[in-house]
Amino acid sequence: MKIGFNHEKYLEEQSKYILERVNNHDKLYIEFGGKLLADLHAKRVLPGFDENAKIKVLNKLKDKIEVIICVYAGDIERNKIRGDFGITYDMDVFRLIDDLRENDLKVNSVVITRYEDRPSTALFITRLERRGIKVYRHFATKGYPSDVDTIVSDEGYGKNAYIETTKPIVVVTAPGPGSGKLATCLSQLYHEYKRGKDVGYSKFETFPVWNVPLKHPLNIAYEAATVDLNDVNMIDPFHLEEYGEIAVNYNRDIEAFPLLKRIIEKITGKKSIYQSPTDMGVNRVGFGITDDEVVRKASEQEIIRRYFKTGCDYKKGNTDLETFKRSEFIMHSLGLKEEDRKVVTFARKKLELLNQEKDDKNDKQKTLSAIAFEMPDGKIITGKKSSLMDAPSAAILNSLKYLSNFDDELLLISPTILEPIIKLKEKTLKNRYIPLDCEEILIALSITAATNPMAEVALSKLSQLEGVQAHSTHILGRNDEQYLRKLGIDVTSDQVFPTENLYYNQ
């Protein structure tokens, strides 16, 4: 993989800049946008970026930091899913707490924003409190967004409980957008100033990158990633007017800035030090870019990947046609097409060959599916669905054989291992879908490795699949999707269901 980003330089630059901000105040509240951990989007568009870079920045400042996690009550009730991990927001809060503690970062509390007394929310709060985690309930802000006098009063932010903090830097994060991070920060500012403390507010958003051109693929990839939010990158007019400098921001921050500035000035009783939404940010990611062309190419691939993802989401009923059309427009606006993702053509060609073989045999029953992997050295490996295993499982085994320099005809897993598993699924468990998925095939390979040295060698190559690009001719089942993700394989799919069943194999 070609590198286009200097991770170490970024860590130094970012931690230094945050410290400079906090030095102006008794305390600094930082609203952390995007992913605090496992920022896979940033990793894909900035080759060389560490997906856990943000947590490493915080770790460098851990003696000065504590973390507040926000989650919107409505997202708990609706079981909103974090797309890149396939887990609900409430479960992602638990994951966040574990990860923060593992990195020696203090978790202050969890805030339920726009709180309403509903069953799922009540259960979530109980589970947190019984594990010794403080929970605060914050309500919808009275007067928001137009009545600043009510917002900044005991009837507005004053109705929320004050969160006791002890560190000079308070990071406010969440599982995803719309979780109430900004409202929590402003509520805390209100309470802090009422207590006579001089506190500040800043925002840490990785994207869009303010000092990269508006139409750069890196910034357009952010639009593709947030197409469901209808985010649009814009030149920051406030920054341009105040400093005569071009800076990129996005529509929601620019639209909210005049109100946000008024609220902060009302809370502090003095003129805001920020003259633009860009001023509020502490992001230094643009200074870590070392090869613009590498970043451009990676960002273009991400735009295509997002198009496929949105298409599958539309097919599954998880998004609307307008969102999919926006994703398609973004891809076409850069002159990109589906086939610019190399593995797409190979997967489709494999399916064509399989269909031709099926026609030759006059086989009308068999449902065919294929997948293609692009290995780190550019080699294309394919897999097909069979009665024994599904296409991703076959591609994984074929890839491991390639990485191990084994003959393609070699059977890595003995039929004596596979047949009892198939029998268990079909006869005992009475499963409707029999072929082994990625999890099952990897367990079978692990068992085989105990007595088969070749299987042991193949198993040792699994880590080399990280970063592999893949494309499936059919929408993958949840299990396969999750296991490919765990292996670090970036997979896209055509908008075609593998069967006509509505429940089985989805």
UniProtKB/Swiss-Prot annotation:
Superkingdom to which the source organism belongs: Bacteria
Classification via Pfam families: DUF1846, DUF1846_C
Gene3D superfamilies: dip2346 domain like (3.10.630.10), Domain of unknown function (DUF1846), C-terminal subdomain (3.40.140.40)
InterPro entries: DUF1846, DUF1846_C, DUF1846_N
Family: Belongs to the UPF0371 family.
Protein name, as recorded: UPF0371 protein FN1121
Taxonomic source organism: Fusobacterium nucleatum subsp. nucleatum (strain ATCC 25586 / DSM 15643 / BCRC 10681 / CIP 101130 / JCM 8532 / KCTC 2640 / LMG 13131 / VPI 4355)
